[in-house]
Amino acid sequence: MKSTRPFHPTPVITIDGPTASGKGTVAALLAAHLGFHLLDSGALYRLAALASVRYGIAAEDIDALVKLIDDLHITFREGCAQLDGVDVSNDIRAEAVGNRASAIAVHGPVRSALVARQRAFRKTPGLVADGRDMGTVIFPDAVLKVFLTASAEARAARRHKQLMQKGFSANIDDLLRDLRERDARDSNRAAAPLKPAADARLLDTSALSVDEAVDQVLQWYRALGQPA
């Protein structure tokens, strides 16, 4: 399938997919290979939440939250999320931060500010954007849209391995149940349900290594006439 989208001077590749589909790792390696900027949209919400706690801004103070989001100094580099130049990748995974992210994201102006920040990551020479609605909502004109899939069993096994490597105990059956429940919620929600864009390339990573998945995306990108 050849893209009919016009060439954009600052190309974007979107990598969407469900939890533990490998999109974060694939996006980071792809960005490093191409020398592109990287956006981890899920981490962006958590970074805003963490900053709001650190600066003492209440979850109900919409005006202060919007200003905070506009002023945040955020970078994603080599798989790390940085706030004000400090790696906070572990801090943003805390349950309390996740709860705060959910609490602030219910406000329309806050969501709009976060969408604007995501789009501001589009800078030369290009961007790889990882998330759930990158190709459908945030960057509908992306030169290449990829939707990663994998069986729930494969994703649960990956998440279990990740947690064990980080020193956390985890039950794979519980992880599998949680993933299936989250998939159902994400696919059926009214606002920006998790689904591939109509013109997205589907890539099942169940039996693929990370390198194989990255190579496939690079092949698609080259086929569009883009240097890779």
Curated annotation (Swiss-Prot):
GO terms for biological process: nucleobase-containing small molecule interconversion; pyrimidine nucleotide metabolic process. Keywords: ATP-binding, Cytoplasm, Kinase, Nucleotide-binding, Transferase. It is found in: Cytoplasm. It is an enzyme of class 2 (transferase). It holds the Pfam family Cytidylate_kin. NCBIfam families: cmk. This is Cytidylate kinase. It comes from Burkholderia ambifaria (strain MC40-6).
